[in-house]
């Protein structure tokens, strides 16, 4: 059965800014997309916490630092300037997950497995601020299924934000709300993407798995 789509006809996606901009963010997952999303948020002036899993042994930040280094060395460049890169703070899920309680926007960009994403969002709900926007960067999984088991309040602040690779250069941000996503959350993300990230905005319907 297809999930009922949010009626987007009343949304003000291209109006002048009517929502506060994001100042801080956390990106969970430091693969190619996660690290470069973090880079472009830093380009827009945000303080960004980039987190990934800790390996079984050795430096607990080895995985996240590898992803961050790849973003800093990317060609074409992911960061506008070296100063922008200094706004990204790396960490790991074991030691630093509570940092997401400090941010305005939490973006999950872990591997495309439903079970892993659900586990991550359960942890996000435990630590995120009650007013934080929470999104997933999935390109293929149903957004509403990722949020299964979460509270109604969480679901109102949750949506899909599909960046295209490389995020700095591809000028499109696909926003995928669920039936439960609050319209003002969609508007806020769309306005920020358009005004601060330089994105054209497409609002897409969530689909069944």
Question: Language-model segments: what does each one mean?
Answer:
Residues 2-14, 47-104, 114-115, 119:
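Conserved N-terminal Rossmann-fold NAD(P) cofactor-binding segment
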Residues 19-24, 85, 103, 131:
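Phosphate-coordination loops involved in phosphoryl transfer and adenosine-cofactor binding
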Residues 24-27, 48:
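Conserved hydrophobic helix-helix packing surfaces used for dimerization/oligomerization
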Residues 30-31:
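Glycine-rich Rossmann-fold phosphate-binding loop(s) that bind the pyrophosphate
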Residues 34-35:
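N-terminal Rossmann-fold NAD(P) dinucleotide-binding loop
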Residues 38, 42-43:
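Gly/Ala-rich phosphate-binding loop of Rossmann-like dinucleotide-binding domains
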Residues 113-193:
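Rossmann-fold NAD(P)-binding glycine/threonine-rich loop
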Residues 169-176, 195-209:
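Conserved Rossmann-fold dehydrogenase catalytic segment
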């Amino acid at each position: 059965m297809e999930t009922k789509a949010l009626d987007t006809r009343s949304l003000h996606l291209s109006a002048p800014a009517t929502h506060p901009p994001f100042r801080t963010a956390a990106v969970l997952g430091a693969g190619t997309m996660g690290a470069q999303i973090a880079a472009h948020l830093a380009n827009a002036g945000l303080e960004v916490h980039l987190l990934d899993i800790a390996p079984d042994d050795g430096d607990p930040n080895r995985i996240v630092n590898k992803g961050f280094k790849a973003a800093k060395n990317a060609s074409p460049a992911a960061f506008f300037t070296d100063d922008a890169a200094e706004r990204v703070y790396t960490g790991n899920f074991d030691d630093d997950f509570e940092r997401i309680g400090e941010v305005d926007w939490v973006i999950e960009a872990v591997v495309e497995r439903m079970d892993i994403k659900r586990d991550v969002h359960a942890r996000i709900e435990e630590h995120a601020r009650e007013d934080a926007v929470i999104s997933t960067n999935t390109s293929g999984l149903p957004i509403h299924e990722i949020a299964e088991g979460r509270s109604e309040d969480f679901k109102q602040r949750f949506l899909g934000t599909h960046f295209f690779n490389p995020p700095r250069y591809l000028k499109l941000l696909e926003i995928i709300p669920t039936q439960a996503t609050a319209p003002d959350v969609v508007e806020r993300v769309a306005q920020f993407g358009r005004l601060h990230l330089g994105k054209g905005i497409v609002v897409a319907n969530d689909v069944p798995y």
